[in-house]
Amino acid sequence: MMGSPLRVLLALPLALALRVDVSRPRTNDWKRTQCGGPSGSADLPTQWAAQVTTTSPPLPEFPRPSLVRGGSDRDRGNQSTWSTLNGIWEYAPADPTAPPPTGKTLEQSILVPFPIESCLSGVAPNSTAAYVNRSWYRLEVTVTATAGTRQLLHFEAANWQTTVYVNGRLLGNHSGGYDRFSVELTHEIFGASASRSAFSGSASATLELLIGVYNPADRGAQPNGKARISAITSPGGDTYTPASGLWQSVWIEEVPAAFIASVQLDANTSHLTATARIDDASVSAANMVKFEVIDPASKAVVASGHSLAGSPLRLAIPSARLWSPGAPFLYDLRVSCDACHDAVLAYFGMRTFTVANVTTPSSGGYTQVHAALVKGGDLLVANLTVKQAEAKCDATAGCVGFTFEASASAGVHRTYLKGGQLKFTQPAAEAWQSFVKLPAKMPRPLLNGGKIFLAGWLDQSYWPDGIYTAPTEAALTFDLEAVRTFGLNTVRLHQKVNSERWYYAADRLGVLIMQDAVQKYGRASNATIPLFESDLKRMIEQRSNHPSIVQWETFNEQDCWQVFKTAPHAVADIVRLARATDGQHRPVDTDSGGGANGLPVGDVNDIHSYPYPRPVLPTARRYAMIGEFGGIGYFARGREWVPGKCHTYLNASSPAKEADIYVNMTRQMIDLAPTGLSASIYTQITDVELECDGFLNYDRTSKFTPAQTAAIREANEKLIAVASAQ
């Protein structure tokens, strides 16, 4: 991506020369298991599973593309500063009463970073009864490090409680299944150096890494999304296989003694505010940091300045190129500290995403926003008058309908129901009509100051072969590329936090992300509260630099919010926590489709409407969103997690029927847009285990022909264009 002039510019002031030699356990013990439901059912790997082998580390890409030390290659990083530990590790279930098995060879082999329950791990339990909630991982590495440097062992994510021993010494504990954490190895390398290398100024030591992981999944109090241990044997409709253990990359990094640990970025359409934190055991506050904004096309420095470590610097960006779905331009940011002998490369996008009252077209008049005839679960005709709907209903068709009257006081912004069934009695269909009195202004989301309709789909980011972990980088990127293939612009990442490389791909591709906080799905207790708050805060801290993320979703439906009733842990306090943690002041969706959505907090009035969309109106301060709808499913034989067990909100008899129903739903969205509807999230991108309502099958094959895909894309593009203009 970058040319050689930038690579020279990014040369480290201090030469780092990390070398890691890994003593891998026997690879012939590893074998991919069945990628399917209960033992004996389908085997459903994705096309990328065959690329996962033990001969080279899986997912070898640099895990932290937002902060590259001493280089400009966000895929490979600077090879002299880091080394992946992904690959085969020793593995064994843990006895909670026994001491750590220091110095002992473990009996099995596991492929990191795939969750224990995944078929790519090689050790997946074949039944709920065989579920393992405590495990040990063991690996021996020989690290050769440069004198005057420090060595860090990074875990991108491990689910849920992690204990790290090195050469028998406890180095750290961590609770949380979705965030990066690290321990320092410097003392173990230099303090216990086994040998001196041929060149001076370095040390070499062999380290035994022993990692303990405990995951009670849904039996614990911690947020764990939709995972259910019971789903291993008996998958549920919307509960899925757990993902335990080391499920994101593990790696070693060499850094200077005082190093740039993080860079916090807040960019709008004209300025960048940047703050660098220095990890320095002596005097971090006295370190002066230089910031240089670089245009990646011309390699020119377009803005620069200095500030003390920990102090924000505000830089004006001349003639700024803005980030948007249609033009996702990313600036590079070189951050250097001469006193630290350190330099890193970050990146950012210039954009704003706000909620503001904007003028309503045709304000003061009445607008028909919804009129349709539905029979037997299928949308027959949209945009009907009541008389037209009645004409299509007869005793055989058996329609039941509702009408809405347009009588309302001036300025009233709501829908009125004029009751009653039509004359037909068989409840096989519905026909209804809705009118809304349009106010002069209403809340809308604005991207870079302009109105935008967010049309997207729900993404649970589960994989039949990796569960939480995509098998390869190409697989990881595939789902985001599919957003554009189908003409959408948004993803709501549901009940999960993905690896940083996923967000980097969204930044590059221009996909807007609504990011869920992970819930305690249906089983929250008071013990959940501090764990939820900690997870939420760390999620925002570690992901807030990404321009693709435009909104935080604090709660979902009835999953978790009911235990957050008393200050300082009430729902409103959680919304304030999200705002305070996020330096970019993104909108907060209090509760997508749940009871807390009715509280006068947050920025979004968000309903769920299955299967068909229904009217939702903005409030005085919150824009209107249908946070989930659809759930149309064609069940593709040979592509099911458990054959014959698929379910969905609305079954379609063929892919063509599924496509037709969806296209009609986009027309309904266009009808709703004049009343303030500003976002719609369709359920969902892929089938997930028994929930078979994706545009894609669970193995990522498409359900649609190219012509059907083109029709869906055209409908979505029209929805975005027309609704954004309202």
Model-inferred region functions:
Residues 3, 24-25, 29-31, 36-42, ...:
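Accessory beta-strand-rich segments of carbohydrate-active enzymes
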Residues 12-25:
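N-terminal signal peptide
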Residues 166, 271-307, 313:
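Beta-strand-rich binding/interaction modules
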Residues 336-363, 438-483:
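N-terminal carbohydrate-binding accessory modules
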Residues 359-439:
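Extracellular disulfide-rich cysteine clusters
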Residues 477-482, 490-714:
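Substrate-binding/catalytic cleft of secreted carbohydrate-active enzymes
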